[in-house]
């Protein structure tokens, strides 16, 4: 083949590539927004911000942190705000999160709105109180087979004002980890490690290829100091069908819980908060009932401890129904039994899935059965007015759905049920 022809072909190819690059650069210059624009918040705060990113990220860079449990992927629907000017038309990815009335009132998802020009937005005033810190892990021990009590300290001199029931967000960096090598087995504990080995959890691996964010309810209450305490359940892959033998399906475990389970005292993490509106109604005299299960313990503990230990509430009838598989999975039990002794208006009710010889031997009072059935059979069935109780619930999805149906059947109005349904 003629060498000149080959060289000519290569030359033409390179020229075409260079022309395409030039066209792309010119298009980017004219089509992609650049430079600074003005962002007005709640009609008062005017920020000069760089255009081109999402509203969620732009606000975060400027110290305003909208909630975003999904890390800005448009699935959780928590980064809601009103874009009064400069937001363009609502996107198809946003429509399922809003009613027609909300769309007419300019509600948008911050993670889906691009900052292209001057913009005016309206956000809840409480969002302006959200802060972000680099925190230090001070404890990360298992309190149940698959649940850790994860505690971090805020930087010295920092403080977070929050209402019990709020949640915090944690940044999950890029990582690649091996459960067997990277999880400190001493922090799992001798009581729970055999179950990890039995179910093969130590053979799991996890990789996160992009930085993201996850939200967890806080278990601490304000009087416990400048710290954040979470109860985090490891999100394992589903088990294989029986016909395929033992072990997990070939699916990666949860990114956020895997990361948290690798952390040790002294490690640094990026946290922000407070977020959320799952808060007790303080200016009420109605009876209160908390309903929880598994890691859903967190916000309920915070609320109960605050109402008893801090506010010394004695003029409202209060009860807490907590459901779990077995006694060795129940944590903070002694705290609630002590509150029951100190506050005659408070009762703690433990529901275990089935009769538990360990609980019987320890003399721990419980009722066998799922928590929604236990609530109905032992309390609400003969209650004069279950529709007048305020219910606060947090737990796995199936539990939450069963409780919702039970309360609906009893005629409890929707506004009397406050819940933080983390779905699993």
Predicted regions and their residues:
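Reductase modules of NAD(P)H-dependent flavoproteins
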Residues: 2-72, 83-104, 309, 314-424
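Fe-S ferredoxin-like electron-transfer domains
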Residues: 19-26, 30, 96-153, 158
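Cysteine-centered iron-sulfur cluster-binding motifs in ferredoxin-type domains/subunits
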Residues: 68-77, 110-114
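Ferredoxin-reductase
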Residues: 138-265, 324-325, 351-355
């Amino acid at each position: 083949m003629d060498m000149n022809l080959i060289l000519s072909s290569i030359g033409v190819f390179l020229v075409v590539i260079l022309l395409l690059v030039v066209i792309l650069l010119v298009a980017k210059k004219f089509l992609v927004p650049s430079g600074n624009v003005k962002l007005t918040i709640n009609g008062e705060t005017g920020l000069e911000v760089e255009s081109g990113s999402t509203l969620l990220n732009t606000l975060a860079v400027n110290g305003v942190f909208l909630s975003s449990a999904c890390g800005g992927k448009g699935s959780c629907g928590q980064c809601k705000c009103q874009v009064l000017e400069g937001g363009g038309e609502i996107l198809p990815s946003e429509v399922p999160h809003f009613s027609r009335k909300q769309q007419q009132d300019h509600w948008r998802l911050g993670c889906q709105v691009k900052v292209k020009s001057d913009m005016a937005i309206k956000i809840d005033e409480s969002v302006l109180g959200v802060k972000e810190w680099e925190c230090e892990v001070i404890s990360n021990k298992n309190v149940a087979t698959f649940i850790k009590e994860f505690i971090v300290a805020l930087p010295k001199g920092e403080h977070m004002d929050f209402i019990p029931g709020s949640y915090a967000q944690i940044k999950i960096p890029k990582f690649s980890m091996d459960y067997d090598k990277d999880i400190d087995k001493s922090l799992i504990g001798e009581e729970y490690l055999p179950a990890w080995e039995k179910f093969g959890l130590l053979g799991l691996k996890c990789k996160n290829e992009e930085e993201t964010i996850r939200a967890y309810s806080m278990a601490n209450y304000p009087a416990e100091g400048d710290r954040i305490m979470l109860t985090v359940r490891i999100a394992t892959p589903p088990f294989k069908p029986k016909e395929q033998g033992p072990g997990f399906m070939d699916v990666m475990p949860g990114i956020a819980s895997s990361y948290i389970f690798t952390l040790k005292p002294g490690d640094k993490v990026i946290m922000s908060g407070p977020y959320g509106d799952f808060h007790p109604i303080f200016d009420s005299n109605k009876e209160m009932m908390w309903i929880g299960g598994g890691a859903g313990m967190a916000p309920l503990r915070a609320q109960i401890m605050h109402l008893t230990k801090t506010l010394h509430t004695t003029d409202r009838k209060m009860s807490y129904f907590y459901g779990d598989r077995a006694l060795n999975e129940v944590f903070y039990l002694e705290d609630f039994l002590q509150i029951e002794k100190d506050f005659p208006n408070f009762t703690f009710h433990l529901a275990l899935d089935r009769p538990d010889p360990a609980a019987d031997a320890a003399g721990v009072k419980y009722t066998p059965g799922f928590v929604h059935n236990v609530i109905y059979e032992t309390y609400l069935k003969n209650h004069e007015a279950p529709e007048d109780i305020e219910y606060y619930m947090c737990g796995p999805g199936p539990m939450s759905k069963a409780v919702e149906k039970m309360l609906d059947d009893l005629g409890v109005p929707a506004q009397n049920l406050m819940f933080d349904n983390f779905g699993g």
